[in-house]
Amino acid sequence: MSVNIPSNSVPSGASRFQVHVINEGHGSGAAMSDSTDPPHYEETSFGDEAQNRLKISFRPGNQECYENFLQTGETAKTDTTFHAYDSHTNTYYLQTFGHNTMDAVPKIEYYRNTGSVSGPKVNRPSLQEIHEQLAKNVAVAPGSADRVANGDGMPGDEQAENKEEDVTGVVKFGWVKGVLVRCMLNIWGVMLFIRLSWIVGEAGIGLGVIIIGLSVVVTTLTGISMSAICTNGVVRGGGAYYLISRSLGPEFGGSIGLIFRFANAVRVAMYVVGFAETVVDLLKESDSMMVDPTNDIRIIGSITVVILLGISVAGMEWEAKAQVILLVILLIGIANFFIGTVIPSNNEKKSRGFFNYQASIFAENFGPSFTEGEGFFSVFAIFFPAATGILAGANISGDLEDPQDAIPRGTMLAIFITTVAYIGVAICVRACVVRDATGSMNDTVVSGMNCNGSAACGLGYDFSRCQHEPCQYGLMNNFQVMSMVSGFGPLITAGIFSATLSSALASLVSAPKVFQALCKDNIFKGLQFFAKGYGKNNEPLRGYFLTFVIAMAFILIAELNVIAPIISNFFLASYALINFSCFHASYAKSPGWRPAYGIYNMWVSLFGAILCCAVMFVINWWAAVITYVIELFLYIYVTYKKPDVNWGSSTQALSYVSALDNALELTTVEDHVKNFRPQCIVLTGGPMTRPALLDITHAFTKNSGLCICCEVFVGPRKLCVKEMNSGMAKKQAWLMKNKIKAFYAAVAADCFRDGVRSLLQASGLGRMKPNTLVIGYKKNWRKAPLSELENYVGIIHDAFDFEIGVVIVRISQGFDISPVLQVQDELEKLEQERLALEAAIKDNDCEEGKGGIRGLFKKAGKLNITKPAPKKDSNISTIQSMHVGEFNQKLVEASAQFKKKQGKGTIDVWWLFDDGGLTLLIPYILTLRKKWKDCKLRIYVGGKINRIEEEKISMASLLSKFRIKFADIHIIGDINIKPNKESWKVFEEMIEPYRLHESHKDLTTAEKLKRESPWKITDAELEAVKEKSYRQVRLNELLQEHSRAANLIVLSLPVARKGSISDLLYMAWLEILTKNLPPVLLVRGNHKNVLTFYS
């Protein structure tokens, strides 16, 4: 027995699932035969409030769950409160697949983009929400887990700010009306009725069919590639631009989008001029010319394009109805032509060259007969625009019900039908009409007259004078041949009107649609004006008027044969990129490339792209060059502007594949000293908190080495991981925004040293592993907790253990500007509050201006709001003064000192110990940078007083072999003498608080002190390394003497032997060594060569 629990019996805070309880008996014979089946789930619909509820069917043995449900409305007994993740309103995921879980079943809503017109974007439960431990006995307020969001994790209460588009009343088309009809009307354009006869007259039947076939090959290959791209995901508005931009990226899409939009606008002019030519021919026959043929074409064309603009502005629904009517007229016209070919010709038609089907005419017209100035490719250039209609359906992709299905089906069928029609008309007209005819019924062959052997002569007409003077009729001279051949001429005229007007109308509609999509993406900032749409169909009215202006300009040319070749290259460029997009997406081997249209091949698409490019140059080489120059210019412009879009293009996919292949290939390359590059881990914390440290490192790694900004989150892993993950993208984005070529990496660890160890061991990839650790000098080492000091010195030891070089950077003001950043954040918050306050005041002013009772109430509100405003301003002023005074302005200036161009000066390199050459290589790389190029290298090395000149010559020889330019070399001969008493006293005072002084105490007391304070400096230790301590103090004296005015000092880092030098003594060495100096880099390589003088 099945019991249906009505929905109103379920508590509002529990579950909205419709539950069907099936056979609740325990082991009874009433058990259903499928009792071993898993729980059954299905989606049901119960009106607006209960869409897509989950129906849970209980199986035998679930009596406890059933009783619990009757009592509490829940499907499981639990003390835990679950969050809601239903697609529409609040609910709990319970008994999913028979278990109490928050896991969500697969739904299409989880995979939609934000603002999708097909439904809302829904967020599934996050991994943390189903993985973390649930807090017990915590009530969840209704609506707290509403997940209908904007795709960025925003809660449901902010949903009002991200309303979905209103799609009610929007006109959408199927594949027949939206694609097939449009493509057929565009392909059966002006060329079918008023140029195809001339084309086959020039090229003959053989080459004419080849011209049609070549065009069909280009369009078919493009159609296949377009179908593959269309079926690789949901297609939105934008047509060819959308396909190319989402496949190859904004650089290609933006450049070709403008060109394609312009080509479509010119295409309107081409069809309107074709229509006007036909009307002018009719006016000639009736002797009703207005001015002259050229100006009449301009007048009629201008009036026509105004009418077409009116239809377009009226909306897509009216335009679609007009297209259907025009197609019916066009089909009648084509049928009328074929009927006319079998109706016996009268004398008037014979005099004009029409003799019905004749084998002699077919044979005579089979070969080409190009007139002066014409050839195969010039004729092809005139015909090819007729084939460009294959994008008519794709160009209105945003107005299709199902673009993924409609575009491939409609486009490929339209290509097939129109190709058959073109070839049929070409063959029929060539088999019936001779090339030249006089139109005079008196030009018959008289008995005994010498015949010239032409087909017309054999059929009783002598048109031989057409060889000496121009004639008005025949395939080569009369553009209205199809009207003459047809059974009823006015129907062909109607067909011409239908073909030309429908094609012009389709182009007039599609060009603004494509342009609107391009402008919405904001790739070209100045074109945002044309992105605005009007009405429920989001009609691009501004784009319509722009297209009208362009079309009007080209209509004034009034010459169809001039206009047609102009757009051929633009359309071919678009086709080439569509084919290349399909090839590129396949070649990139991205898992996201999964087109449902399987009839494609990447190499065929590449062939199609090459064929399009070749045809462009063959048709008109200089026009092809101009097209590519324009496209290249636009490509460079978009690349330079770097639009803020991310479409997952195949260019990005190929970048990944290339990087992966190169990284793998690099692993097979053995290390060589000539290929050494500094690959640095920089312990910056958040990159924005220590910009100076990052700047100096970036100066010697940019374009030549690896730079990884690292941060260690210390604390409970659970909390640290959450904080770390939330800031990853933001910090990497900060690096990109500041044009710093570096990566950001972070780890969570229980202590700082463990985190750095992990980074030193695991950072990098293959050969791109860090070989140098860069850290800032710990300025507060005397005040810092002992654990921090141990960690700091410990990571230096760890780096040496891992055979990684170390660079310690010291500047007088320190690196950390976190306090300044905190103040800036506060200022930004206050500024946002101030702007919001001003907006609220402005809104209240507007409401007050409306008058009435409502305005009276708003007036009081305005007074309450305006009072705190001065207080906010005073707060801002106070914090600004804090920013300048309390937070040291010198710290801000010091943080930017390496961003500035360094003036003329020196980089002093104190290469005291040979570490493999890193101490010399880093300053050399710095001098190659634009900001440091005015700084000269001065080299300081230790030596003996009696051998200064010899050692100077020796060092100069070594540096010249290393090909390192230097300004001067100094040999320091007195480096090992004792420092003066004042300097030594400063050092002794520095270490005094940390000394144990065990030698002045008895043995027992001394041992006790050592156990209690093992970190302190013992007298024994200090005596053992006294000479080294002398050296650090003496070096500072020499640095003060020789390098006080240097822009930068690069100095060999002293190494503390483990177990011999305490952490405090080592930090005292570093302190006294770098005290009161310009910026200092303490460098120690891993003692492996990084310089060589061998080629």
Curated annotation (Swiss-Prot):
The keyword Kinase does not apply. It is found in: Apical cell membrane. Residues 1-173, 219-255, 320-323, 397-413, 627-1095 are cytoplasmic. InterPro entries: AA-permease/SLC12A_dom, AA_permease_N, SLC12_C, Slc12a1, SLC12A1/SLC12A2, SLC12A_fam. It comes from the Eukaryota. Its main location: membrane. GO terms for biological process: cell volume homeostasis; chloride ion homeostasis; chloride transmembrane transport; chloride transport; diterpenoid metabolic process; kidney development; monoatomic ion transmembrane transport; potassium ion homeostasis. Expressed predominantly in kidney (at protein level). Residues 26-45 are annotated as: Disordered. Keywords: Cell membrane, Chloride, Glycoprotein, Ion transport, Membrane, Phosphoprotein, Potassium, Potassium transport, Sodium, Sodium transport, Symport, Transmembrane, Transmembrane helix, Transport. Residues 195-197, 277-298, 345-375, 435-546, 589-605 are extracellular. A motif (RFXV motif) lies at residues 16-19. One of its GO terms (cellular component) is apical plasma membrane. The modification Phosphothreonine is found at T91, T96, T101, T114. Changing T114A: Loss of interaction with PPP3CB. One of its GO terms (molecular function) is protein serine/threonine kinase binding. Activated following phosphorylation by OXSR1/OSR1 and STK39/SPAK downstream of WNK kinases (WNK1, WNK2, WNK3 or WNK4). The chain crosses the membrane at residues 174-194, 198-218, 256-276, 299-319, 324-344, 376-396, 414-434, 547-567, 568-588, 606-626. Phosphorylated at Ser-87, Thr-96 and Thr-101 by OXSR1/OSR1 and STK39/SPAK downstream of WNK kinases (WNK1, WNK2, WNK3 or WNK4), promoting its activity. Glycans are attached at N442, N452. The modification Phosphoserine is found at S57, S87, S116, S126, S144. Changing T96D: No effect on interaction with PPP3CB. When phosphorylated, interacts with PPP3CB. The RFXV motif mediates binding with OXSR1/OSR1 and STK39/SPAK. Belongs to the SLC12A transporter family. This is Solute carrier family 12 member 1.
